[in-house]
UniProtKB/Swiss-Prot annotation:
Superkingdom of origin organism: Bacteria
Family: Belongs to the UvrC family.
Role summary: The UvrABC repair system catalyzes the recognition and processing of DNA lesions. UvrC both incises the 5' and 3' sides of the lesion. The N-terminal half is responsible for the 3' incision and the C-terminal half is responsible for the 5' incision.
Name of the featured protein: UvrABC system protein C
CDD domains: GIY-YIG_UvrC_Cho
An example Gene Ontology molecular-function term: excinuclease ABC activity
PANTHER family: UVRABC SYSTEM PROTEIN C, UVRC/OXIDOREDUCTASE
Cited PROSITE patterns: GIY_YIG, UVR, UVRC
Lineage, opening ranks: Bacteria, Bacillati, Actinomycetota, Actinomycetes, Streptosporangiales
UniProt keyword Repeat, yes or no: no
């Protein structure tokens, strides 16, 4: 897969200023929006090493036909413009936070003459005050039922309110004093609005004021020997305390903050938020997002803050954005985010990572919830038997297979200009990753323009040659056993003895043709082959002129994407290690005055080249036999190695 020549901007045409850029497809539709402190540096990163890009970034670049940008003066302006464009275009490749479920809110319709309290879901409406979200709607109804004793605001629908107004008779709640019955004029407009605003104030955390007020009224009633009224007020106080007890106290009474934590893996991320008002947890919410590109946790935090707080209406920003936002990782452009949030709120907003105390403990709780949300989401999609069965059935139907492919093997090639070419093989059985079966290959003979295709032919040939050899060996062992061979010896199945039902290759028609040709040359006819191209996620079959397009919501497509992305991750991690090993080894070999004895001393002292590369010149000079001048030379040479290549070895099988 390559980048379209028309997509790559001319050298020097991209400015170095901050700005926002848009990728468009061949129909002119915006498919991705991003921002950058330096447009030239950011956009150039998309056109360097295509194979090293995140799988979904490769898909985006392959789909794009054009890119344009807008220069701005500050990073704050870039953040604002990025949010505006994402909201306007809804680009398919931008991160989109979606709920694991539709969370209910307690809503007060302050935009109405007589505000109503109700349960609301979905998009926010202008002029409505929201509290929550809550995990369950019944929790809201229980809370409202208790609060109506003290704040008898209406909960009826517009139709019921209109009928009561016409008939002059209130509903049942009006008769039992759980509604002030504005429909029949028992309370004036201004007095009723004050009552609704008191309800909102209590829900916002101003609990102490109302408790003190009611306690004073109860004492006055008792002193005046109005014992029935005092008893009613006592019950009102108990109702408020019951509501407060349901909301755990976690921080100081004056603390208003949102606590945001992100848990992530290679493909997805989960965000969990606890809403703290008046020191109490007033609500919580979780999102799950597909990672479109290889973004940092700080960038995910920044994108989440922009999408979450950017959606608040200007008139509601003061209440939607708290004074303090606690995050698990600092936003990528913290100063710009803080300035933008402060401008929207109309007052200072502090965005920080808590380091100690109660806030740090609460952050760890929120992070644990985020990890559980991600695990629950992945389990639901990947481990649920019904979902897995559906995915495998969809794949079988789309590819015309006689039965579901219970064992899928996916192969991916990773190379850089034909050097250090490697391949990966990942295995999914019954829709689940079987990591003990993963294999990796160092490609021996793939060079030149068609190295990717040649490498695919080689790895398929090697894998299935081993299959034929080992299956024959297993047959010979079975024959020996039947003829009286010694019993009791452990018989462990060879690593390549089991064939897959389906081979998936990362690529389009050329890669699929190479894989099929390798199988044909070996005389293997009972293994199906398909390829998943990054462009538009097309599924290619051998000998077909046109690809198969699975629906984007298809569980079968989701499983194929997971298999392909896992193969890509496994291949590229091995490729980086191999390339880094070769590069660092050659650097040590080329350093003047550094012979075998000194190299051995360095490795013995630091344990590995990677740790040596992380050491300072002074630390290197502490090694016996290494002077300050040699240490400085070693330090300068090793620090020139690309940082992205210093990856930790992955726990996997040895090269095949």
């Amino acid at each position: 897969m390559t980048v379209r020549p028309t997509l790559r901007p001319k050298p020097g045409s991209i400015p170095t200023d901050p700005g926002v850029y848009r990728f468009r497809d061949e129909h002119g539709r915006v498919i991705y929006v991003g921002k950058a402190k330096n447009l030239r540096a950011r956009l150039s990163s998309y056109f360097q090493d295509f194979s090293a890009l995140h799988p979904r970034t490769q898909t985006m670049i392959s789909t794009a036909a054009d890119v344009d940008w807008t220069v701005v003066n500050t990073e704050v302006e870039a953040l604002q413009l990025e949010y505006s464009w994402i909201k306007e275009y809804s680009p398919r490749f931008n991160v989109r936070y979606r709920d694991d479920k539709s969370y209910p809110y307690l809503a007060v319709t302050l935009n109405e003459e007589f505000p109503r309290v109700q349960v609301m879901r979905g998009a926010r409406r202008r002029g409505v005050r929201y509290f929550g979200p809550y995990s369950y709607a019944w929790a809201i109804r229980d809370t409202v039922d208790l609060l109506l004793r003290v704040f008898p605001v209406r909960t009826c629908s517009a139709g019921v309110f209109k009928r009561a107004r016409s008939s002059g008779r209130p509903c049942l709640l009006g008769y039992i004093d759980k509604c002030s019955a504005p429909c029949v004029g028992r309370i004036g407009v201004e007095e009723y609005r004050a009552l609704a605003e008191d309800f909102c104030a209590f829900m916002a955390g101003e609990t102490g004021r109302f408790l003190r007020q009611l306690e004073a009224e109860m004492k006055q009633a008792a002193a005046a020997q109005e014992y029935e009224r005092a008893a009613r007020i006592r019950d009102d106080i108990q109702a408020l305390r019951t509501v407060m007890e349901k909301q755990a106290v976690v921080l100081g009474d004056s603390t208003d903050c949102d606590v945001i934590a992100i848990a992530e893996d290679q493909l997805e991320a989960a965000v969990q938020v606890f809403y703290v008002r008046g020191g109490r947890i007033r609500g919580e919410r979780g999102w799950v997002v597909d990672k479109v590109e290889d973004v940092s946790t700080g960038k995910l935090v920044e994108q989440f803050l922009a999408q979450t707080y950017g959606g608040a209406d200007d008139e509601e920003s003061t209440t939607a954005i708290p004074r303090e936002v606690l995050v698990s990782a600092e936003p990528a452009d913290r100063d710009a985010v803080v300035a933008w949030l402060s401008k929207r709120r109309g007052a200072a907003v502090d965005v920080r990572v808590p380091q100690r105390g109660d806030k740090r403990a609460l952050m760890e709780t929120v992070l644990k919830n985020a990890e559980q949300t991600l695990a629950r989401h992945k389990s639901q999609r990947a481990s649920d038997l019904t979902t897995r069965s559906k995915a495998l059935a969809e794949i079988a139907e789309a590819l015309g297979l006689a039965e579901a492919p219970l064992r899928i093997e996916c192969f991916d090639i990773s190379t850089l200009q034909g050097e250090h070419t490697v391949a990966s093989m990942v295995v999914f059985e019954d829709g689940l990753a079987r990591k003990s079966e993963y294999r990796r290959f160092s490609i021996r003979g793939a060079e030149g323009a068609d190295s990717d295709v040649a490498a695919m032919y080689e790895v398929i040939s090697r894998r299935f040659t081993r299959y034929l050899e080992e299956s024959q060996r297993v047959g010979e062992l079975d024959t020996l056993g039947e003829s009286g061979a010694p019993q009791g010896a452990e018989r462990k199945a060879p690593r390549f003895a089991y064939p897959p039902n389906l081979v998936v290759v990362d690529g389009g028609r050329p890669q699929v043709a190479a894989a099929q040709r390798a199988l044909d040359d070996l005389g293997i006819e009972d293994v199906a082959v398909c390829g998943l191209a990054k462009r538009l996620e097309e599924v290619w079959l051998p000998g077909e002129e046109d690809p198969i397009i699975l629906p984007r919501t298809s569980e079968g497509l989701y499983l194929l994407q997971r298999v392909r992305d896992e193969a890509h991750r496994f291949a590229i991690s091995y490729h980086r290690r191999k390339r880094a090993k070769a590069l660092t080894a050659s650097v040590l070999d080329d350093i003047p005055g550094l012979g075998p004895v000194r190299r051995a001393a360095l490795l013995k002292h630091f344990g590995s080249v990677r740790r040596l590369a992380q050491a300072t010149a002074a630390e290197i000079a502490e090694v016996p036999g290494i002077g300050e001048r040699t240490a400085q030379t070693i330090y300068e040479r090793l620090t020139s190695v690309e940082g992205g290549q210093r990856t930790q070895p992955e726990n996997s099988k040895a090269d095949e």
